Every structure is written in C-alpha cells, then in structure tokens.
C-alpha cells in the first residue's frame, strides 16, 4: 500500500472432509477404496476492493485504472437551461457514439453520457471522486468550435483542445 504496509489479498483454508461427508463427495484411492474428499476454500475477499482504493486513491478520491473502470470516459454536457441545451445534448450523444467505435483492450471504450439534472461542476467533482479516468466537458461554445475540455483523472490535467486531436493521446492513456 502507499503507506508501505501489506494487505492480505486472499484467503485459503483446509476444510477437511466434513463438507464432503455432508455432500457425499467421494473419490477412489489407488487401492480402489472409496474415500471422502479433502476440501479447501480459497477466495479473494472484499479487502481486494479496499486495496484497489488504497493503491489508486488520492486526497480527491479514487483514481480508477482504465482497465477496471466501469466508465473509461464520462461526457458531461454543460447545460444552461436554455434553447442550446438540446443541441449540446445531441452533440454529446454523437461524440459518445464516435468514442464507442474506438477499441481499447479488444473491446469498445466504456463511455457514459451523464445527463443527470445537476450542475456540471457538481457532476465533474462527483466523477473526479469516483475516479473516472477521463472526463469530457462540452458546452455550447465548445460545440461551435469543435472543442471540448478533456480532463485526465490521474493528474487532473485539463486540455481545451480540438476534438479531432483530443482523443488520440487519451485513448492511448486508457490503453496503458
């Protein structure tokens, strides 16, 4: 862990023959005799989730590795409760479809369009805490200029670049 301590990741137990006797699980030994099986139990516990959080967290929350992130890219539309909102949402839906066409780890990117009726700044902070590897913010001006704010969660670097070039290094990051 970050503090130099170890974490027991799994557990392994010898259970004897009790479960085999209760379930009637037998095998034939080398002499042809029926014997109750000796059983074991092994598993990864919920401590593993804690280990991921402790290893990949910082003061702002989780920094989820792209390989295990439920959503590798989260798109946040910057809505203003005006006539442009539907156009921004349509643009974000189109962007999501473009990103879903990209493959990383042999599968499509996992992209979420966050359409909750919450202020964009609150959504951003929520996704920073949840550890989304890449957060994309799109507002009316961005849409008109073909831009978006692309934020990497691992270093909180924000790039306000053109969409045509914004995702090549980001998808390489997701694939790393």
What are these regions (language model features)?
Residues 1-176:
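NTP/phosphate- and nucleic-acid-binding module
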């Amino acid at each position: 862990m970050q503090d130099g301590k170890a974490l027991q990741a799994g557990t392994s137990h010898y259970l004897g023959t009790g479960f085999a006797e209760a379930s009637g699980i037998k095998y034939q030994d080398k002499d042809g005799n029926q014997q109750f099986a000796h059983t074991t139990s092994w598993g990864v516990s919920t401590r593993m989730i804690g280990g991921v959080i402790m290893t990949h967290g910082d003061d702002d929350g989780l920094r989820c590795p792209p390989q295990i992130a439920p959503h590798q890219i989260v798109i946040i539309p910057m809505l203003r409760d005006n006539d442009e909102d539907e156009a921004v949402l349509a643009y974000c839906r189109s962007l999501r479809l473009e990103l879903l066409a990209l493959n990383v780890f042999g599968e499509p990117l996992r992209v979420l369009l966050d359409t909750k009726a919450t202020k964009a700044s609150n959504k951003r902070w929520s996704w920073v805490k949840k550890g989304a590897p890449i957060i994309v913010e799109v507002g009316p001006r961005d849409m008109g200029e073909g831009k978006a704010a692309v934020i990497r969660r691992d270093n909180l670097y924000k790039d306000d670049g053109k969409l045509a070039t914004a995702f090549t290094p980001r998808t390489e990051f997701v694939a790393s």
